[in-house]
Amino acid sequence: MKNILNKIYLHPLLLITIFIFILMGRFKFILYFMLLILVHELGHILVSLIFKWKIDKIIILPFGGLTKYNQLINTPLIEEFLVSISGILFQTFFYVIINKYIDYKYVYLIHYFIIIFNLLPIYPLDGAKILNVVFNKITSFKNSILLTAIISYLTIFFLSLILFNINKIVFMLLIFLFIEVNNFYKERELLFNKFLFERYTHSLKFKKEKLINNVDKMKKDYKHLFYIDNKYMTENTFLKKRFDIKGNL
């Protein structure tokens, strides 16, 4: 537990938000806000530890936490889904319990704001991660990254038009999220190459197999059989040829 506490980082946006609410005299508001944010992130952390994910850093933001993992890209989709949704479920369960004993009318607003905001399809929010799992179920890994980034950009654009003159704090959060989405989009080729290189260097087991004719069609949770130039080739053989020629990343 001490090791995890050492990895917690309070983002400047969170400190600004706390300062603003303290100036406004909203001590109870910020207290319950922080409590629900920490409970939300605790849900992610507990489930990730069950799957033995390695935690690099836990960033606490005004809308929740952002836990960065040192984890294989080829992690099973079911694990990604359960870790992504666990924060919302854990927070909701906690809220249902404490709501009976807390006499503060704004607790429900805080709870639903955190839930709704985290369900927005903007990377790296929970909503976008869950959506990315869905995309990975129906299309290739490469397409999933692109689709997640496009939907994230569009959501930020429309929310910015609505909130620019309404809520400056949320607008600042959208600017932060835009930077995160932009980095995610710029690194899509690097992520794809890491996705391939992991399969080349690790003995990964998959129950399902798929026949494809292009490396861009590779999917998570699948082993692939390539059919190129009228020849069949196993995934291992294809990746060996690819990285023997290109060398390391």
Located regions from the model:
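Hydrophobic transmembrane alpha-helices and their immediate loop junctions
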Residues: 1-249
